[in-house]
Amino acid sequence: MKYVIILGDGMADEPIPSLNGKTPLQAADTPTFDYMAPRSRMGMLKTVPEGFHPGSEVANMSVLGYDLPTTFEGRGSLEAASIGVDIERGEMAMRCNLICVENGKIKNHSAGHISDEEAAELIAFLSEKLGSDTVRFYPGISYRHLLKIRGGDKRIDCTPPHDVPGTPFREVLVNADVPEAEETADLINDLILKSQVLLANHPVNKKRIAEGKDPANSIWPWSPGYRPSMPTLAERFGIKSGVVISAVDLIRGIGVYAGLKPVAVEGATGLWNTNYEGKAKAAIEAMKNNDFVFVHVEASDEAGHEGDVALKTRTIEYLDQRLCKPIVEAADRMQESVRIAVLPDHPTPCRLKTHTSNPVPFMIYSKGENADGISEYNECSAINGSLGTLETDGFIKELLK
């Protein structure tokens, strides 16, 4: 048996008036999901344990069945693994967004989805001006970068910028949870303020403003953590070989710690215009020689953060017709059985423009296996699935059993 997870980040939503009370998943034209649904077992998955923030790092680790209270160490350390940055003892890693601040308020978490090339130039500039033996910046993709602090204390309260669009940034600066962490909080806040001065008149931002684009005029570090201790899927379930396919450093980093080999796909952007066909082709190729394939698509999440209902619906259709369809067709042709799961990691409702902790719908498809006979796959239908509501490692064990 081979196993494939197709994860549409943030794909789940809530009923939307402009869609006649349907969710984007219900409203989208999804012939592949419609084919899979009556041939699948369904259920709901609680991906955000009590006490955890509904971030993609938490939710994707939950999908893979990790025990969050014992393994979670923040987003930064996971993303570091993806870009080959080692987190040593005594070092703290953080996600470091490039964001847009306008009139003292956070306009968006992505600096208008700044390009990789522009972002790399800005991160190199900040590294030159603000870097030291204590502070290191590392470039990632688009607005997503890495900050490493030697001697940093993770006991700080950091606000994810995508949770607070329109909020005065000074209201959500870093706070220490314990007195011992005040030095770390002060250091990070100082870096934020200094970055704003340095970036205000940088040529990259002057050019972006002239083109009518949002400037990347501030950094925003968040999700601190140390090096995680995560057993691999091979150690936990005997998976002999597997790959992770994603445009997002976070997901590739989770894959690295899970023992999965990252596969790069040209044109994978993390946005609606990602290379769906390229990802499908990479997954089909990986299925030939691997037991486990994890395909992650970010597009629906970004559309949800923008509150763009039409775009989110379209990204679900692209996922269905341009990625799922060729993978399912290839799986059905293989001599060896293939079990395919489709699910989001968390909802990103367009109304809220941020993540929620609500359980997400999943279906597990395999040609010739017992099925629930439910005609559609969405947030409402999956509630009636035979697998009920799962949590912790319930989903991954059900997939791999």
PLM ranges: what are they?
Residues 1-401:
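Feature captures the catalytic ectodomains and active-site-proximal regions of enzymes
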